[in-house]
Amino acid sequence: MKLKNRQPKLNADLRELVRTNAECYGDKVLYIYKENGEEKTVTYNENWNRMNALGTAFSRIGLMGETVAVIGEAHPMYMTAYYAATCGGGVIVPMDHDLSDDQLAEFMALAEAKAIVYTKGFNHRLTALADKMPGCRLFIPIQPDEEEAAHPLTQTMNELIAMGQAALDAGDRTYLDVELDRNKMCTLLFTSGTTGTAKGVMLSHHNLASATNAACLSMLQFNDKSRFVDALPMHHSYEVTCGHFAISNLGAEMFINDGLKNVSRNLAKYKPNSEMLVPLFVETMYKRIWNEIDKKGMRQKVETAIKASNALRKVGIDMRSKFFAQITNAFGGQLKVIVCGGAPLSPQLIRDFDAFGITILEGYGITECAPLVAVNRMGKGRLHSVGTAVEQCQVRIDTSENDRQEEDIAEYGYPTGEICVQGENVMLGYYRNEEATKAVFTEDGWFRTGDIGYMDKDGYIYITGRKKNLIILSNGKNVYPEEIEEYLSRIPDIQESVVLGRKNAQGEVVITALIYADPTRFEGKEKAEIFETIKAQITDLNKTLPAFKQIREIEIRDTEFEKTTSRKIKRFKVM
């Protein structure tokens, strides 16, 4: 198969995606990565062949069609496991690598995972948890040391691939011929919390293929000449759908980053022309640019150059590559486009990057929509907006619960409301949670995102920043505040709390706890003493939580929170 034009190919399921990628791009490099200090590559053909070999091995050992978890750092074999499980009729469960041991065990039990695939950082840690995960009968290390490989419960990834390849060579077509139910769950993504409050998002092949197709149709600026440096967590739905499925479908090349501390070095070395990032990375890049400019006393000169460059562009002369080469060389010198989603970026940041020669396209997504919902298209972007709805889905604004429409119209020109989505990318529901599933769908079948915004006359969507509950951190991670509030409610000294995301002094959105202490326990105490007592208790709580869920800022209130007649805190009053 050869592509005759720039229109991306569309696929009905993940197996078709990997197969047609191999047919289209063959021995072209898909992944570049480092292992034990050595640079290695994986081609599109190798990606397809490895999937079939591992899937065939799964069929031989009773794992085909079962639930398999995967956890760890970025590695091509992570995606091999993802494809092998889902394309054999089974379910993959990507786990957050920041989970505690207890949370890992709880999620494994909840998902009923029969095996777990993991990268080097989890050697020994997972096998040591075997007693806490009795349902997990096989541990599959990707990069084992001798001790891990010899463990009685492990079978290494390379061993399984060799087993599967031998079976394929002998004519075993069990895995190759399996019929996929495209409407059945193939991916289970836990959004937040422990088993008491977690929501497991169920996505099908149809959901993921639809989201991938939509991403490709919305990002026509990317093609088989595009190069990316991958820098996002592998369990993140944005990373998998947009950063692996869509990028591979377009024939692009990806360098898999070997640690956050090496991102800048790898950008400079591998010279990407395209990136998909979360706001934290972009904001960090932006701060570094201006910090360096200020250190050299060049701010006025750069600002003057920006004005001159912008004036020249208006008459068709683009001098950005000359004027700002010293700035863009820090990112390899060839970066032209960044797609960014997860939290809003400042318009000034977007304008400055554009002035330097790098276009930022903001988008919007949510795990329950696999995840892409909207994105700004190349040449058609609008500041403050997350773009228009992608193919495969529709968006509407539900203003039925908005009692301040006149104020909204005065402020934005349009009434705000809850962003609702309908389409082929919308999840099957929450795993074993009919009540939660029912709560997020309207009577006519639209998914309630829980985010508030408005849509202009041209269909551009704007998120006003007033979320219903979900906190989106600067690194793109999602946190449900109810979970943290539940933990705080167990502290006797705390009477009421509201957890939200606020920007700290560095401009990063962090978990912030607003606390109303029990006045009966602090009679005669000064506010400073109350603060220190609560701070110590929250420090102890933080030790039990993953880093991204830890409370970073504390504010002590003098009065109770305002409440509804049903005694629920009016969260929007403290946002």
Name each model feature, range by range.
Residues 99, 116, 423, 428-429, ...:
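AMP-binding/adenylate-forming catalytic core of the ANL superfamily
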Residues 87-163, 503, 519:
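Structural core segment of the AMP-binding/adenylate-forming
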Residues 26-29, 140-141, 155, 165-190, ...:
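Conserved pre-ATP/AMP-binding loop-to-beta segment of ANL
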